[in-house]
Amino acid sequence: MQKQPSPESLAPSAEPTKPPYSYIALIAMAIQSSPGQRATLSGIYRYIMGRFAFYRHNRPGWQNSIRHNLSLNECFVKVPRDDRKPGKGSYWTLDPDCHDMFQHGSFLRRRRRFTKRTGAQGTKGPVKIDHRPHRATSPDPGAPKTTTGRLCPFPQEVPNPKGLSFEGLMGSLPANMSSTTSDVRPQLPTGPKEMCSAKSGGPRELSEATSPSPCPAFGFSSAFSDAESLGKAPTPGVAPESVGSSYQCRMQTLNFCMGTDPGLEHLLVSSVPTPGSSTPSASHRAPLPLPADSKEPWVAGSFPVQGGSGYPLGLPPCLYRTPGMFFFE
């Protein structure tokens, strides 16, 4: 008895597998196998369907992919059809420079993406583009300085003038400062004995003459404020006698005002030389220790003048001393 074939064997064969070639390789094979190395779009379709059973069935999508690859890849060149030959559609051929697109002629391996080289017509454009930057960067030999001046508007080396240097400015300062300070420096009074000796004028005139001070409450004279300037910048024009006497008067005033020890005043008086005469004047004598009374005279001098409260004074009649204050009347 003969066995009947199984239904599985009667079933159609399995679906063919897709070939391992890209669409570019399929198009290249179709063009190379056609006469004249050129083929139309319909001829490419027929070649692919006749060789590979996978594309025989009308599967949508692959034909559109063939058209896209023909138009997008530069290795395929479109050649217009001759009017003398009947038919419709243009021919497609391979670019002559794409012979090495596949390795060893194998369509399975594509070497690299093909880029179309510039032809005879395309060389004119790049040549102009190349010449334009060459003209811009290579100036005429006759005018090299103008281009360098445009590129660098500022001079490369700027001379440093001596007048603007720091040393030049500081070198000229001492001369100017010395002349300015000598003019602005306050001149000390040449006759300091006038402040420490009695005058024939009344108390009101003496107070007006000796009281233009910034501290009217304490009655400091303007000469008292110059004590620091005298120690810092001595004036060569003042005699040593006048300097010593003025310094003694100022220190006496300061000591009486601040209430220091009277023993220091004897040291100050003894340290000051008096080249004028051997006997000290009334202004140079050491003051006597003062009691704690409210108002007392300094020293009994040779010019007794009636004060405001009836006390005889040895120094200017307008000077009085209280335990915490020294003022002019």
From Swiss-Prot:
Region span, Disordered: 117-150, 174-213
DNA-binding region location: 17-108
GO MF annotation terms: DNA binding; DNA-binding transcription repressor activity, RNA polymerase II-specific; RNA polymerase II cis-regulatory region sequence-specific DNA binding
Location within or outside the cell: Nucleus
UniProt-listed CDD domains: FH_FOXS1
Domain of life: Eukaryota
The entry's keywords: DNA-binding, Nucleus, Repressor, Transcription, Transcription regulation
Phenotype on disruption: Accumulation of blood in the central part of the fetal testis. Increased ectopic apoptosis in periendothelial cells of the testis.
Biased composition (Polar residues): 175-184
The protein's name: Forkhead box protein S1
Natural source organism: Mus musculus (Mouse)
Primary gene name: Foxs1
